[in-house]
Structures are given as C-alpha cells and as structure tokens.
Design a protein with these regions (language model features):
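Short hydrophobic alpha-helical segments enriched in small aliphatic residues
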Residues: 9, 19-22
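N-terminal glycine-/serine-/threonine-rich phosphate-binding loop
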Residues: 29-86, 95-108, 112, 143-165, ...
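A glycine- and small-aliphatic-rich helix-loop capping segment at beta-alpha/alpha-beta transitions
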Residues: 100-111, 131-134, 184-195, 229-231, ...
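Glycine-rich oxoanion-binding loops at beta->alpha junctions
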Residues: 119-165, 208, 213-214
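Conserved phosphate- and dinucleotide-binding cores of soluble alpha/beta proteins
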Residues: 168-169, 177-251, 259-268, 425-427, ...
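Gly/Ser/Thr-rich active-site loops/lids in small-molecule metabolic enzymes
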Residues: 188-206, 258-273, 385-413, 501
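Accessory alpha-helical/coil subdomains and C-terminal extensions
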Residues: 214, 232-235, 257-354
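Internal helix-turn-beta structural module
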Residues: 398-504
C-alpha cells in the first residue's frame, strides 16, 4: 500500500507497512480509509513512531516554517537584503537543517555565492552541500565532546566574528548541540570538560542542570556565540529536545540569554557530591566566576544600533509536534488514542513501572484497541560499574519487569529516542511485549538481574527486540508508543475518568 502519511511532506510517496491494515474502500485517500480494528503488533507501533518522527524532520518542518514567514511578510526573512548570509550551528538535525535551508534559499532567489556556513554534525550525517560545510564532529553513539567538535566550534566562533555590519547570521540548533559545540573556557582542557560531563551523566543530572554547568565552562554556550556576532541580525532556528522548549537550555543556548549563574553551576556539582571529583582547573574557574573575576554569561539579548534585539529565536519542531503527528496516524489506523503529553521526566524505572500499571488497568477497562502516546525524557542514575544501554532500553526493560508480574498479553510498548540513538549503542530503544518474555524464559534470562546491572542492551539483543531505525537526523527527546488490546470494558476516555477517580 502507498499513500501520503500524516506529517509527511506533501507529495512524498511513502510505502506503508500493511500488516496492520484491513481492506480499503475504493477511491479513498488515507484520511478516509475504512478498516476494521487493526491487529496490534510491533509493525503498527513502529509505523506510529515513524509518523511522529517524520513530522519533526527538518526537510519537512523547516520549509514549512519559512513559507509561513514569507506569507506573513516578515521583513527579517527577506534574505536578498543581506550582503552575506552566515550559517552556523550544531546538533543531530544539523545536516538536514542545513540542506533544507540551502534549498529554501535557492528557491527564494538568493545568490548562494553570498552564503557561507559551518555546522557541526554527527559523522554519519555528513553530505556535500553547495555553500555550508558539514563538519564531522563525532561518531554515532558517542554523545560527548570530541577534539573534532572543539575544532569545529572554534571555526564557528571565527565565522560569527567575521560578520559585517549588515550581514545575517542563521544559527541552526538541535538536540545534541551541547556535545557537538564544545569550546572549553580558557585554562580548561577538553578532557577535563569531558570528565565533568561524564560525572554529571553518571549521577543522573537533568539536562537543565548539566547545561548550567556546561555554560559556565564554555566560550560558546550560554549566549556567548551571540555576544561574538557583530552583524545586523541573528535568526536562530531550533528543533527542541528539551521539555518546555526553554531557549537557554536547548544545546546550552549559544545565542540565548542565560538566567543561570556561576553559583547555579556550583550548586549542581555540590548537589551531586562532585566538587572534589571534578578537575582542579574547573573548580578554580568556577570559583573565579563566583568572586566576579571573570564575566558572567550574558543575561540579555544583544541590541542593534536601533535599540532592538539583534537575535530572534524560533522553535520549528518539538516533542509536542511529534506526539500530535503520531496521534493522527494512530487514529487513521483505527485506534483510540490517549496522549500523556511531552512532559514525562524523572528517574526512568519508576516512570516505566507506573506506565506498566496503567497499561494493566486500561486493558481491563477499554473496549477498543488503544494507543497511549507519551514523550519527554527520563534519566538513569548509573553506578560506576554498569552494563550497556540507554534510557529508552532501560525504560522498556523496567516496564517489562513490572508487566511480567501479571498477564502480559495484549500489551506492546515501543520506547525510542527520536534521534535514532539511545545511549552509547546502535539502537534507538526497544520493544516490550509478551513475546519478549517468552524468549527470555526460553533462554533463561533473568529480567531483574539485567535491570540491576543496567544492561538492557544485552538483554534485548539476546531476544531480538532492539529497535534500530538508524539516525533520523532530528531530535525531539523520546517517543513511546504503547498499544493495548482490550480485555473488556469501556472506552479509553471513560477509563481515564475512572482511573482519576480511583487514584484520587
């Protein structure tokens, strides 16, 4: 079967897996297909996940955004008025954003000889572009600063400094930008900065906490890139990987004012007991900041000669957009849909166990096959000795462990990172269902042992339940698709009402 999927660019013909579709009414489009309740299986869960991710890919959302600005007559987006257009940035979506931008500029009649750019991206996404250099800054599965990324960040800073008074800077920011744009403060080596980041990751620090520290040991984060730009206007285009889309947190806000301080960075390290573990150079740098001996990160947007801000930020896509597209596809596939929203956060295991309890409850209450969709991003606190995995694989394993304590049939979970990566692995996440439990029992695998060791990758690899979609060239946190086959009872909406009544 072929057709235009919800969330896919107009005219993009996509082959749709048909394992879960019933017969189609003649002469009907995808929005009018008539089908019996679909069979719930991994293929359906994966198709829903892909529909959500496709809607937040740059080749779809960036042209849509620019077209909207053109129709609204926003003078800032008349690209022909600028002598030079400088393009910089970093993130997992950087390559696709740069390619889509070049194509959009060409369509707008811009002479590309006036365009110059440098964007730090994962190695696997590099491709030749006409005027924007895509710099291979790190290999897949290495979500931490590298010497290659630091070199690229220095080039980006130099390019921003080269702007003339009437030039435009377009900054392309997406998830993963913090690790792809490392430029340590004077006196701090990249290895020392890596040591700090690894310690924070191990402790389960939130992205906001990590970035408060990163911004205060960096020459490019926390608004410092915008501070170095000397041109007319900076337009920052963002694909958000942070709950609530805070501009100062996404990729550590290289062009955004920073509300955090050296005191905040110090407090984060103190909270996790890391002050004695971090390198002396980092501790001394932060202490100098606390004493006011070195400048704070900028707290306001830089102003132009006309007194107006020289930087404007635009969020093109977020976790909410992916959830909406996934929900639309699920409904058109014949499912009832419940959205838990883009705000799930906290320690992975208790969040996953709660979702497993909800799945058991709803299965007894709903009467239609239902998709329960959730986003956000949980965290995993790791001991120094641990196995292999990522937060989505750990989520699926904790969910499965809880589900195994009752009847696991009729429930399928797909937990996946929308960037196609999950921790330092080649998987985006994993499936959790009754078949996984059967395979584990056959092989004598103890779920609790793997969960205790934080070794979810090894477990799911052994039972052929890893989810490996490859790099998606976007990143809007995580997307979980939970499919539930009804045992008996009422509608999904009524089940929610009843749950709130009993839980309250």
């Amino acid at each position: 079967l072929t057709g235009n999927r919800p969330g896919f660019a107009s005219g993009e013909n996509i082959a749709l897996p048909h394992a879960f579709y019933g017969s189609l009414a003649a002469n009907h489009g995808i929005g009018e297909w008539i089908m019996p309740p679909p069979a719930l299986n991994r293929a359906l869960a994966e198709a829903i996940w892909h529909a959500g991710v496709q809607a937040v890919r740059p080749q779809y959302c960036l042209p849509q955004f620019l077209l909207q600005r053109y129709r609204e007559g926003d003078p800032r987006f008349d690209f022909r008025q600028y002598p030079r257009i400088l393009v910089v940035g970093g993130g997992k979506a950087g390559a696709a954003m740069a390619a889509a931008l070049e194509e959009a500029l060409t369509s707008a009649g811009v002479d590309l000889s006036r365009v110059e750019g440098w964007v730090n991206v994962p190695n696997e996404t590099v491709r030749p572009l006409k005027r924007i250099h895509l710099h291979p800054a790190r290999p897949m599965g290495v979500n931490e600063p590298t010497p290659e990324a630091a070199y690229g960040a220095e080039q980006i800073l130099q390019l921003a400094r080269s702007a003339g008074p009437d030039d435009l800077l377009i900054c392309l920011i997406s998830g993963g930008g913090s690790a792809l744009l490392p430029l340590p403060a004077e006196g701090i080596s990249l290895a020392e900065k890596q040591q700090v980041v690894r310690a924070l990751l191990r402790c389960g620090a939130t992205i906001a906490e990590m970035n408060a520290v990163r911004k205060h040991i960096s020459r490019i984060k926390g608004g410092r890139l915008a501070q170095e730009f000397t041109g007319r206007l900076c337009l920052t285009l963002i694909i958000s990987d942070v709950i609530g889309d805070p501009l100062d947190v996404i990729a550590s806000g290289p062009t955004a004012p920073d509300p955090t301080t050296y005191a905040d960075a110090w407090s984060v390290l103190e909270k996790y007991g890391l002050l004695e573990e971090i390198p002396v150079s980092v501790r001394e740098h932060l202490q100098r900041g606390l004493r006011g001996e070195i400048p704070e990160t900028p707290k306001d947007l830089p102003l132009g000669p006309d007194g107006k801000p020289r930087v404007a930020h635009f969020v093109l896509a977020s976790n909410r957009h992916a959830l909406e597209a996934a929900a639309q596809f699920a409904r058109q596939s014949g499912l009832e849909v419940l959205q838990l929203g883009p705000y799930l956060e906290g320690e992975t295991r208790p969040v996953a166990e709660t979702l497993a309890c909800l799945a058991r409850y709803w299965r007894e209450e709903i009467r239609q096959p239902t998709a329960i969709l959730s986003g956000g991003e949980t965290t995993v606190s790791l001991p120094k000795q641990h196995g292999k995995g990522g937060r989505n694989q750990e989520f699926a394993l904790a969910f499965l462990h809880k589900l195994s304590q009752s009847d696991p049939n009729g429930v399928i979970l797909l937990a996946g990172g929308t960037d196609g990566e999950d921790g330092p692995t080649d998987a985006a996440g994993a499936f959790a269902d009754a078949e996984v439990l059967r395979q584990a029992q056959t092989r004598g695998l103890n779920l609790a042992d793997f969960l205790t060791r934080h070794d979810a990758y090894t477990f799911f690899d052994a039972v052929a339940a890893l989810f490996r979609p490859g790099l998606t060239e976007t990143n809007v946190m995580d997307l979980r698709v939970l499919l539930i086959e009804p045992a008996a009872g009422v509608s999904a909406a009524d089940a929610v009402t009843k749950w709130h009544g009993t839980a309250g």
